[in-house]
Amino acid sequence: MNEKKEQALFEYDAKLSISEAIPMGLQHVVAAVVGIVTPGIMIAKVCQLSPSDTTILIQTSLIFSAVATLIQLFPIFGKVGSRLPVMMGASFAYVPILMAIGADFGIAAIFGSQLVGSILVIIVGLFIKKIRVLFP
């Protein structure tokens, strides 16, 4: 019997060779850029932003996706982040809501609503152990 031992491409503390890391990294970047850029383009179109403001919105999406990806890969204080090669990006779940807000109130209202929402998520996160008993 000839058994072939299969080895995972990524292990928790593995070090990839450069010949494995570059193609995998390029694949992740190509797959992620479309998903990160598209929500910004859709929201900019609804809010009737100028081309320069649209560019800033797209660049901001790319920068914060990179920061979130780095936090996942290299955890902060060992608590925030998974230490796994997880590509973070923009979520399409909120695009219809943001488009509705942007069509009526503009891009400033979108940023304000996201700021309030992020503060609420932080507050809920502080009390998650106490809240968890409410959700069996």
Where are these regions (language model features)?
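Intrinsically disordered, low-complexity non-transmembrane regions of multi-pass membrane transporters
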Residues: 1-24
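Early transmembrane hairpin of solute transport permeases
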Residues: 21-135
